[in-house]
């Protein structure tokens, strides 16, 4: 999940925040 988010989210976002924002379906 963290990897997926880090790749999809911009560098400005943190892995944790991204995980919740762009959580895979």
From Swiss-Prot:
Listed GO MF terms: toxin activity
Residue ranges of the TM segments: none
Major subcellular location class: secreted
Keyword set, alphabetical order: Disulfide bond, G-protein coupled receptor impairing toxin, Secreted, Toxin
Outcome when changing residue 9 to Q: In HT1-0; increase in affinity for melanocortin receptors MC1R, MC3R, and MC4R and 4-fold decrease in affinity for MC5R
Known outcome of mutating residue 7 to Q: In HT1-0; increase in affinity for melanocortin receptors MC1R, MC3R, and MC4R and 4-fold decrease in affinity for MC5R
Tissues expressing this chain: Expressed by the venom duct.
Consequence recorded when altering residue 5 to Q: In HT1-0; increase in affinity for melanocortin receptors MC1R, MC3R, and MC4R and 4-fold decrease in affinity for MC5R
PTM annotation, UniProt: Contains 2 disulfide bonds. However, cysteine pairing is not critical for peptide binding to melanocortin receptors, since peptides with different pairings have similar potency at the receptors tested.
UniProt xrefs under SUPFAM superfamilies: EGF/Laminin (SSF57196)
GO-annotated cellular components: extracellular region
Subcellular location: Secreted
Other remarks in the entry: Many analogs have been synthesized. Among them, the linear peptide Hunger-Toxin (HT1-0) shows an increased affinity for human melanocortin receptors MC1R (200 nM), MC3R (40 nM), and MC4R (15 nM), and a decreased affinity for MC5R (200 nM). This analog also binds to type-2 angiotensin II receptor (AGTR2), but has no effect on type-1 angiotensin II receptor (AGTR1), vasopressin 2 receptor (V2R), and the five muscarinic receptors (CHRM1-CHRM5).
Domain comment, as recorded: The cysteine framework is XIV (C-C-C-C).
Function recorded in the entry: Peptide with nanomolar affinity for human melanocortin receptors. The natural disulfide pairing being unknown, the activity of all three possible peptides (with the cysteine pairings 'bead (I-II, III-IV), 'globular' (I-III, II-IV), and 'ribbon' (I-IV, II-III)) have been tested. All three isomers show similar affinities on each human melanocortin subtype (MC1R (~500 nM), MC3R (~100 nM), MC4R (~50 nM), and MC5R (~50 nM)).
Protein name: NU-conotoxin-Ltg1a
Natural source organism: Conus litoglyphus (Lithograph cone)
Lineage summary: Eukaryota, Metazoa, Spiralia, Lophotrochozoa, Mollusca
């Amino acid at each position: 999940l963290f990897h997926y988010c880090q790749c999809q989210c911009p560098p400005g976002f943190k892995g944790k925040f991204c995980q919740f924002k762009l959580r895979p379906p």
